[in-house]
Amino acid sequence: MLAPVLMVVGTASSVGKSTLVSALCRIAARRGIRVAPFKAQNMSNNAAVTANGEEIARSIAVQAAAAKLTPSVQMNPILIKPEGQRRSQIIVQGRPWQTLEAIDYWQRKQLLWEIVTNSLDQLRQAYDLVIAEGAGSPVELNLKAHDITNMRVATYAQAQTLLVGDIDVGGIFAAMLGTLMLLEPEERQLIAGLIVNRFRGDPDLFTDGIQILEQRSNKPVLGVVPWLPQLGLPEEDAVALERPDQTTNNAALTIGVIQLPAIANFDDFDPLAQEQGVAVRYINQPHELQHCQALILPGTKHTLAARQWLTEQGFDQAIQQFQGPIVGICGGYQLLGQQIDDPEAVEGIGGSMAGLGLLPITTIFQRHKQTRQVQALSNLPWAKAYPLAGYEIHMGRTELLADQPAFSIQQAESTHADGCMRANGKVWGCYIHGIFANTEFRQAWLSRLGWQVQSAIQPIDPFERLADHVEACLEPNLLTKLLGQEIRD
């Protein structure tokens, strides 16, 4: 017998679907329900690596953590990583499949439906409940024939489906009622209820709004979820960086992260932003560097295009003259070197470009993609021999022109160098994503910048905080009411 599926779809992108799925996963898990997240297809350059070296969306790995599970590739069988110029790398079952333009992918998309259903069925066989997430809106009519993520999944699984709307951006009635109107009748029947997300103020003032939605939709409003600030969970994609909520006024230390084109895995820097007295500021203009005590060049899906963009924006001289510490992660590490070569046009345009010249390294792109979890030791003078854990996702091979490795990767029978540093450790870079999630290393680097460790405060589990917040706003025993005895004990 296959386990039931609870589906979460939204009126648009960025309405809070991923966060709601995380909340529902933790609510179910702490009741003893063996629950797994699922998203047929995700488009994001924020990726995670499973224990088997497979690449999935970072948001799915977060949902797996909420469900108290180790992430697996079945939870996200298809990942689309935009590279710019209408091209994307398609990851299928955790491995690179093809790099395609959008129209080519649409034409081949239906070939992947069997992979989607096989992955979903495997989860339904292994767990008591699967909570599936849609993508964007389920009623993008010009794209719906090619949609393998939203109501096609719900229909296949006959899933009880929640429709989520973001009231904070306005237009909740048009968004909710319009979405329901545009669904096919058989799809509309699967909608079990509506969730109004990100409500600011007193929810009691929305009583009339609930009545309007219920009367016009013939669907119950199952919850009004208030805005929850500073959640402490990674954002799904770079849309979040456009929100004007970067508060640095009260920070003793501001770290600038250059918002490169096709920025990738920017959740690497969330642990920095969560430290008291530290602000992470995403910057687009060279003059913003004057407000920063340290600078980070993040990962990017298109290193050569990012290098050209830095020159066009006037960053070259500003970076060269920056007096504070400089760090490069993955693509940002490549940018700090002497030369970047792409003879096989792995990134699409090919060619060679000079790097920023701050580290003695050269990089050449290859079609083989390195994806793995790693354990390492730091060689940096202010964090000597600190143990680290993280993961790598890259297609370039970088050679050191001087014997100055920043880290030593520890493997079963050997070690090898990763990253590079200047002798004093002021400028360094590496391929290790998640490096700042290592508390001892993170705080050592911040201390080098003049930051002082704050008094120890027992951290609150963000998943528990989220689950408490959402559960208090939903219909009591929502999962049981929706799924009843279908959830296996």
Swiss-Prot record:
Residues covered by the GATase cobBQ-type domain: 252-441
Pathway the protein acts in: Cofactor biosynthesis; adenosylcobalamin biosynthesis
Function: Catalyzes amidations at positions B, D, E, and G on adenosylcobyrinic A,C-diamide. NH(2) groups are provided by glutamine, and one molecule of ATP is hydrogenolyzed for each amidation.
Coiled coil location: none
InterPro entries: Class_I_gatase-like, CobQ/CobB/MinD/ParA_Nub-bd_dom, CobQ_GATase1, CobQ_N, CobQ_synth, GATase_3, P-loop_NTPase
Stated family: Belongs to the CobB/CobQ family. CobQ subfamily.
Transmembrane stretches, start-end: none
Name recorded for this polypeptide: Cobyric acid synthase
Native source organism of the sequence: Herpetosiphon aurantiacus (strain ATCC 23779 / DSM 785 / 114-95)
